[in-house]
């Protein structure tokens, strides 16, 4: 297993603390997610990544071989498995300089999905993304993080199921292996019908029906760059497959240990300390689950955006460094250094809100006095948003001086309510560009879904819940 923090699978994320990147040794393992058991290799991830980047325009096998450095024979074997799984389909033909036209392959975004959860102190956001990272559905409901861990797990599971039902009225979304050669050998049909009599798999509609009150389901923005349209090809069996939920990414306030999936003493909610949230939710849903801090998830999602300019990132290659500062019910930071998500030696990096900037300042929930979080939230409570922005700017300037980062991105519920005030106020203090991270109100939840999606394409490492026993895999979400 790769130990530098940029590997794939059940990695620890130790070493340099970075979990973002597309590199990795040949043969490195990908997460053991439902439907991907035959593709846990760095080579398959590289092929999938090129298909993802190519978008609807597609890419030929020869171009895949040139782009990955693999032999044409290896590419043919990998793409055959991908087609059999339903993740890839033929997209037509493209003229070549000589000989017959080349067959073009494309990713099938609706073939698989990931759920992203943002557990805030008073609110739960659930999103569903397809393979291309496009928002398919979302649900926002009140949440009491202090209601007790078991009660929160059950409430979260119910909302996940509600969103999947709203986004998938045909009943096609389920947990378990995709049809085709990638099947784990355990048929899910009997389990699905046993739990849902009369349930018939169907295609996920292009425009999902709206869900119940509190939810919105609908297509996201077009994710693909403009490409020359290939000539249409005959549709084959690989274009028709049931749609699967690969896993669930969970983001919540820290501190926490993302490798074990266990929160520590969340400020104001000490009862979460030591609770095995990741594994408890995996057991309840019957899906692989990954857990990380809310700010880490947001930073990961922002760094992975295909259309970086639309989010105000303008990332230049893989070496960009930025801090994402999130001010909502608390204050924290997600750090991307040299292109890698930085978690620190003990996974605790980014506890930005608890740096002391006023020794005789107000008490903080962490037990100290004068923390920048306490000062910011006090100013917000007093209605002094400009003052809160200045305080946040002091902390941001300190962070820039310490880490020599390229830019500062702002997000969170409070910032979004007065974006201009915060961008100006922080920008007056910080010596680098300060921008609003235009991921919108669901930046954290969408980043959480990327905890599941990014490893599939070899773009990040992940620490998932242990493999579920055979009796729990391949089950329909209840």
Residue ranges of model-derived segments:
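Phosphate-binding/catalytic loop of phosphoryl-transfer enzymes
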Residues: 117, 224, 240-367, 371-376, ...
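Short beta-strand(s) of the beta-wing in winged-helix/HTH DNA-binding folds
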Residues: 89-90, 95, 257
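Short loop/edge segments at beta-strand edges and connector loops
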Residues: 90-92, 291-293, 438
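Conserved beta-strand edge residues that scaffold enzyme active sites
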Residues: 95-97, 296, 414
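ATP-binding/phosphotransfer module of carbohydrate and carboxylate kinases, centering on a glycine-rich
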Residues: 1-89, 99-101, 106-180, 184-185, ...
């Amino acid at each position: 297993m790769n130990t530098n923090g940029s590997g794939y699978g059940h990695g620890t994320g130790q070493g340099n603390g970075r979990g973002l990147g597309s590199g990795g040794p040949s043969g490195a393992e990908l997460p053991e997610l439902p439907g991907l058991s035959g593709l846990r290799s760095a080579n398959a991830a590289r092929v999938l990544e090129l298909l993802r980047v190519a978008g609807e325009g597609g890419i030929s096998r020869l171009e895949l071989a040139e782009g990955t450095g693999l032999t044409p024979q290896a590419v043919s074997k990998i793409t055959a498995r991908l087609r059999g799984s339903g993740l890839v389909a033929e997209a037509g033909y493209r003229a070549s300089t000589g000989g017959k036209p080349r067959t073009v392959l494309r990713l099938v975004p609706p073939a698989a999905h990931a759920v992203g959860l943002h557990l805030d102190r008073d609110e739960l956001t659930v999103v569903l993304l397809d393979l291309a990272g496009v928002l398919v559905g979302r649900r926002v409901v009140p949440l009491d993080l202090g209601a007790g861990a078991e009660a929160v797990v059950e409430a979260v599971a119910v909302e996940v199921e509600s969103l999947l039902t709203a986004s998938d009225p045909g009943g096609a979304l389920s947990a378990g292996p995709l049809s085709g050669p990638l099947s784990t050998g355990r048929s899910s049909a009997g389990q699905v019908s046993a739990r849902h009599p009369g349930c018939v798999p169907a295609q996920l509609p292009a425009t999902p029906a709206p869900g119940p009150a509190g939810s919105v389901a609908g297509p996201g923005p077009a994710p693909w760059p403009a490409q020359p349209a290939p000539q249409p090809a005959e549709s084959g069996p690989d274009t028709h497959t049931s749609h699967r939920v690969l896993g669930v990414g969970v983001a919540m306030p820290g501190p926490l240990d993302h490798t074990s999936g266990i929160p520590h003493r969340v400020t104001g909610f000490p009862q979460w300390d030591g609770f095995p949230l990741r594994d408890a939710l995996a057991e309840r849903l019957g899906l692989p689950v990954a857990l990380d801090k809310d700010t880490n998830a947001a930073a990961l999602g922002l760094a992975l955006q295909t259309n970086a300019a639309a989010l105000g990132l303008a990332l230049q290659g893989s070496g960009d460094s930025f801090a994402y500062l999130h001010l909502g019910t608390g204050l924290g930071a997600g750090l991307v250094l040299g292109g890698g998500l930085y978690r620190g030696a003990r996974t605790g990096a980014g506890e930005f809100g608890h740096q002391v900037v006023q020794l005789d300042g107000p008490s903080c929930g962490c037990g100290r006095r004068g923390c920048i979080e306490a000062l910011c939230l006090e100013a917000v409570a007093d209605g002094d948003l400009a003052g809160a922005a200045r305080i946040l700017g002091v902390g941001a300037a300190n962070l820039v001086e310490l880490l020599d980062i390229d830019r500062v991105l702002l997000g969170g519920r409070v910032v979004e309510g007065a974006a201009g005030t915060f961008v100006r106020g922080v920008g007056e203090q910080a010596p680098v560009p300060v921008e609003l991270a235009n991921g919108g109100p669901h930046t954290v939840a969408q980043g959480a879904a990327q905890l599941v999606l990014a490893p599939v394409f070899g773009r990040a490492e992940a620490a998932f819940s242990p493999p579920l026993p055979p009796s729990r895999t391949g089950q329909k979400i209840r």
